[in-house]
Design a protein with these regions (language model features):
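Elongated, amphipathic alpha-helical interaction scaffolds
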Residues: 1-137
Length: 137
């Protein structure tokens, strides 16, 4: 695969997306605006975090992963339409939970989690800039 010249990279290119979001202040500002929440402090954003809890299970690689004191966030860039996006989101969220909760720990220690997909295309076709879904227990 031929690499694009750096001058042609945009925010949606994996390399550029990672470099921009690696800046904790930019990442924090993006999350606060997107989720309409206040974040006091985030730990350093981790790029391409891999989670593979079992040899035979399907592992994941999170584009940008970060935490604050009681929440975890995953920000993904999606450059093409993927009909499996809803189930992929569900799987990513469950894998993040598995990664957070060690053996012997209480379920109350699970943090609130957010999985955000930034899509170049309108996945649902309603011409909206943002779609929000909540899983509740």
């Amino acid at each position: 695969m031929k690499l694009k010249p750096i001058e042609e990279l945009t925010f949606t290119d994996d390399f550029m997306f990672g470099r921009v979001m690696q800046n904790a202040e930019i990442c924090k500002g993006f999350l606060e605006r997107m989720l309409e929440i206040k974040i006091e402090r985030i730990e350093y954003p981790e790029l391409q975090k891999s989670i593979s809890p079992h040899y035979q299970s399907k592992g994941i690689r999170l584009d940008v992963y970060m935490q604050d004191s009681n929440r975890v966030f995953d920000i993904e860039i999606q450059n093409s339409l993927d009909e499996n996006l809803p189930k992929r989101t569900r799987y990513y969220q469950s894998m993040m939970d598995i990664d957070l909760l060690l053996k012997g720990k209480n379920y109350t220690e699970l943090k609130e989690s957010f999985v955000i997909f930034i899509c170049k295309d309108d996945f649902f076709g309603f011409n909206l800039p943002c779609y929000s879904f909540s899983n509740t227990c």
